[in-house]
């Protein structure tokens, strides 16, 4: 259980001391420095003007800062098309000494002058060693003053149930996630143009690391998301694309009512602190508003190194529609600095 936290690890096997009138358990733990700040810079060229565009984000993660196991995450993104988003969350594990986690999330999206959306959610999770089982409530509101087609005001409320199985690899400082399986389902109602309709969402996420040898490691993930509702509008669709999903595309540039994504990194470790990797991502997504059923893919290469104060990662990737020839013109260069403190 200790090794599945991200702020402590065992440095020696636990010991038990039996006496005539008591039993003592001795744990030998080491606190891990897991507070982090990510700075991300992305360069690409405009196909029409040839100008270089700059995008970026700031991501702060605070873990066990107050020695209660809490996790505070803050992720802000700003893109060249005036698309801004803020994803934040606070998690209190083993709340008030109970086996339950308490989580609150706030997500904000501003899509230029088209619309603004805000999503609030509260979840309670039961810890069962490596398994978490949760229930939660989610509220989403979206507003628009524009007269753009397929964008409308709406609000929705969902009741969510979820289950997660997670195994960490505390010995791997660069790729610490060994296995993760998440299943989440939400059901509720949506009010749009004074009409109430049913709304259902589900998400499946599987991440697995394969250690072929001390030098070769494959990190693969499969993600599937779907939203079901009548009279879908653009501002309620799932958004994906970018460095945290299918690379080689702009962040959150793809709008879909459902998608399936396979992302792979084949990593070759030059030593304990440096590795190079290949990128191959493949996805299918549907957009019933635009009657799209599209296959896309991306490929590229990357490099990561562990320094005394954090991790530096650089990757070069290009996204394309399936069936189109692959070339590296207008590919994206991502530079990520993760500082631990």
What is the predicted role of each segment?
Residues 1-182, 210, 239-242, 252-256, ...:
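Gram-negative/organellar outer-membrane beta-barrel architecture
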Residues 263-265, 298-304:
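Short glycine-rich, acidic/polar surface loops and turns
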Residues 281-284, 309:
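C-terminal beta-signal and adjacent terminal beta-strands/loops
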Residues 17, 304-306:
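Well-ordered beta-strand positions
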Residues 284-288, 322:
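Short, solvent-exposed loop/turn segments at secondary-structure junctions
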Residues 131, 214-216, 272-274, 310:
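Secondary-structure transition into beta-strands, especially the periplasmic turns and strand N-termini
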Residues 44-49, 160-270, 278-279, 286:
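C-terminal outer-membrane beta-barrel translocator/porin domains of Gram-negative envelope proteins
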